[in-house]
């Protein structure tokens, strides 16, 4: 059994406002992230993602940063971190991020018209974050070459009604207080 699948099966579940969450090193930073798990995930991302002529990896703060950094080190593709803080730099693009539990403003810098980007995130759950990011990138004139989330949580999400395909490494659900693997190969 692969490390990602086993780590999800072992993940504790918490409830917040009626929503069930798994607590996992990729999505939460706890428990600690073992290098073997990160290495496995990075290798699978590199094999699965459309990286041809990608200029930049675009990732939201905070939980996409460690994954994107490791992918960047292996591919020599630079990273753009979408921040929750406004810097006021020329070309900065604001976006509204809505998730199952919060709403925030986020800001993209260093992505320009014609840039070919990979959007990389930890979890696809409600789709609010990835939808806001891809919409904002399209407004800048960037070419979204691919969108990849390590883990997809079952259920409807905001990308279902779009033509945006999201690749995932593993698809899970939370049922009866535990993680259930729906598809250990993910989407695409």
UniProtKB/Swiss-Prot annotation:
Record's keyword terms, sorted: Purine salvage, Transferase
Organism superkingdom: Archaea
Family: Belongs to the purine/pyrimidine phosphoribosyltransferase family. Archaeal HPRT subfamily.
Disulfide pairings: none
Cross-referenced Pfam families: Pribosyltran
GO annotation terms (biological process): purine ribonucleoside salvage
NCBIfam families: HPT_Archaea (NF040646), PRK02304.1-4 (NF002635)
Protein name: HGPRTase-like protein
HAMAP family: Hypx_phosphoribosyltr
GO molecular function, one term: transferase activity
Its job: May catalyze a purine salvage reaction, the substrate is unknown.
Record carries keyword ATP-binding: no
Enzyme Commission number(s): 2.4.2.-
Cited CDD domains: PRTases_typeI (cd06223)
InterPro entries: HGPRTase-like, PRibTrfase_dom, PRTase-like, Pur/Pyrimidine_PRTase
């Amino acid at each position: 059994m692969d490390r990602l699948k086993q780590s999800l099966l072992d993940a504790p579940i918490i409830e917040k406002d009626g929503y069930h969450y798994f607590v996992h090193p990729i999505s939460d930073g706890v428990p600690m992230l073992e290098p073997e798990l990160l290495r496995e995930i990075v290798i699978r991302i590199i094999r699965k993602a459309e990286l041809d002529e990608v200029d930049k990896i675009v990732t939201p703060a905070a939980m996409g940063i460690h994954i994107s950094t490791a992918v960047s080190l292996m591919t020599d593709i630079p990273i753009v971190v979408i921040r929750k803080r406004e810097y006021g730099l020329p070309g900065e693009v604001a976006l509204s991020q809505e998730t199952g539990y919060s709403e925030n403003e986020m800001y993209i810098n260093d992505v320009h018209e014609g840039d070919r980007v990979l959007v990389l995130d930890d979890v696809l759950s409600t789709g609010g974050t990835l939808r806001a990011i891809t919409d904002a990138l399209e407004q800048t004139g960037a070419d979204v070459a691919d969108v990849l989330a390590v883990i997809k949580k079952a259920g409807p999400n905001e990308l279902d009604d779009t033509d945006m395909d999201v690749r995932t490494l593993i698809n899970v659900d939370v049922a009866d207080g535990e993680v259930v693997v729906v598809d250990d190969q993910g989407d695409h």
